[in-house]
Amino acid sequence: MKGMDPMRITRIATLCLMVIPAVPGLVHAQAAAASSPKKIEVTVDAAQVSPPVSKYEYGMFIEHIRTLIYRSLWAEMLDDRKFYHPITSGGPKAPPGGVTRRFRMFLSRRWRPVGPDAFVVMDTEQPFVGEHSPRIDLDSSVPHGIRQGGLTLVGGKRYTGHIVLRGNSGARVKVSLVWGEGPNGRQTITIGALPVAYQEFPLRFTSRVGTSEGALEITGTGSGSFRIGAVSVMPADNVDGFRPDTIALLRRLHSGFWRLPGGNFVSDFNWYDSVGPRDKRPPILDHAWNAVQSNDVGMDEFMTLCKLIGTEPYITVNAGFGDAHSAAEEVEYMNGAVSTRLGALRARNGHPVPYHVKFWNIGNEPYGPWELGRTDLKYYVLKHNEFARAMRKVDPSIVLLASGAMPDEETIEGIASELHLKDYQVPFCSDADWTCGYLKHSWGLFDGITEHWYSRAGVRFDLEAAKKGKRYQGMEAGYVPVKQTVLQWVRKPSNRVHLKAEEWQEYERRFPGMIKKHIFMSNDEYAYTARGFREGPNLKLALAYAMVFNEMLRHTDFLRMTAFTMGVSTLDISPVAAVLNTNGLLFKLYGDHMGAGMLPVAVTGNSPQPLPEQHPFDGFPHTNAGSPTYPLDVVAALSPDRKHLTLSVVNATDSAVPLTLHVNGARVTGKTTLWKMTGKDLNAANRVGQSPQVQVKKVAVTEAGNVLSVPPISVDIYRFPVAPRPQ
């Protein structure tokens, strides 16, 4: 995940939520362009079949960005539960003004003293975990201790957990879950005599009422002092530590794989600290995002997450501050037999059966100036090669992916200018072309190459502006504002997929061995982003991502893996509930009907897409994304048994568009079924606690003949029963 100055593109909000605000003045879709023909025709050739859709087509990526994982997936209710931060009454106690509900829930909470600050001491003498543990000094009958507020509680819900304590025999400790004022606004557990050594005590609560201002208090009276090693509180219905609501929804999305750990975080990640008893894993400061990580969701928890969701893991190793030895040992921990040193450690941690993780990515965005441990390409390929050899020595069966960056990434994202190249433009196979660098210098030491892309709404890249160093609203040089129609807005991110495909085909031309060795591309980070954030994904964004999916399905010969940023951006989430948002609804729609094993077929038409207006490097791109059915976007595929033909049609205009369908190589033998995803307008969205504004409805198609009436502002999946045409 790219890093930027904190003031640029409301960074944390964009990365945590990947939400796109509505663009003022573009609430309604526009009519179809006048230049398109009155009668749009599409011809599907069922005899021209591409390789099947990979089971990894709709994968997910998530990063340890501040509290993102811990709010959305992990069920722990307490922040800093192992006390990295000093506990004082100072510092901000409320979120800054203007923070929306969705962003507010991702802000980290702090512990505060109960009573004067002087009675809470961060003691470095024999800490339970990390550098210190809080010591609470006591003063007879006046309670002293610590408190964390801002907890969301549900009335009647049970909560379980534990606390690790030690102290003097004269200390009397109470732990309270607080939901209101007075003695009736809390449930208190009295801990018995404290031992000299740290001991774990169970916690069980039931909240009588619901509140978003709940708290946990740990206080003591008596004489001497007591120390708190760690504390944990989760809803009792957690599933192996994870939220049951978000897990259940994510199981429905046919993700194929989840990439974790990954992102900028991984370049400062010590995987050794993320295994073993959770209470004893040290909390650390993640320097990539300048935030504390508890290490609670570590390597074994990631495997549990994948099992619960029903997907495969994909691990990125630390090639920033990390080394080949630790990466190889990480492979051994995950995949090694119990007879190996790290396999035995995994078994002692409760997981005797090897995980057999297949996909491994060496490094995250090593080309980026933002990446911790960055070095030049000529040195990094040496590092990659060392990592690859060491990791394959441990497990020769793993699939290794190199972290590439094509000329579009280097040019459009401003990386070349950051490196002070003489020419801002990055030609193919120049010293700044990382993807070509692997093809030249790491051949045989990777099976696939990763590519990341983030397309930005409301701006376009201009090479001349970039050369002059012009910056717009803190973005990299070269981005200039642009007025877009809705159709242009919706089509924009799919053009980035298409550009990646054109570049890949150029590499295949220069390096023919790529095809023979089945070298594949993985877009294992991608998103459509914009400045600011409001209320999250909507129908307009779903239309854009549908065109992204369609473009991905046109390149199944080499684009075999993709991972959406972020995986939980498919959900609308509150602290106590979650629903599929429009992103999630779209992933489910395509996973259900255009998923693994489907066979894309050739599509032609009579209405070409507009040509590119910009060619930032080497004349690329040559064409734009989409089918020749403008303003519609159409992709088609046969079912694995070839008994059904499925069409995905995206209509971002405000009118129904007639589409005349011709099928070659097969004949339609029965009634057509339509799954239609739409809403009342482009801002329609699905939110927690509200009736869904965007739905997928199964519709019987009544049109006679071969003309389909494609509904306005909709994503439409048509399925036709087919049989081979007689010869």
Go through each PLM region and give its residues.
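Bacterial N-terminal signal peptides
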Residues: 13-25
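Aromatic/acidic polysaccharide-binding cleft in carbohydrate-active enzymes
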Residues: 56, 64-65, 265, 456, ...
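Conserved, mostly hydrophobic/aromatic
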Residues: 60, 163, 254, 306, ...
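Solvent-exposed strand-to-loop "edge" motifs in beta-rich extracellular domains
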Residues: 164-168, 206-208, 592, 650-652, ...
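Noncatalytic carbohydrate-binding groove/subsite architecture in carbohydrate-active enzymes
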Residues: 214-218, 225, 334, 376-545, ...
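Carbohydrate-binding surface patches
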Residues: 627-668, 674, 716-719
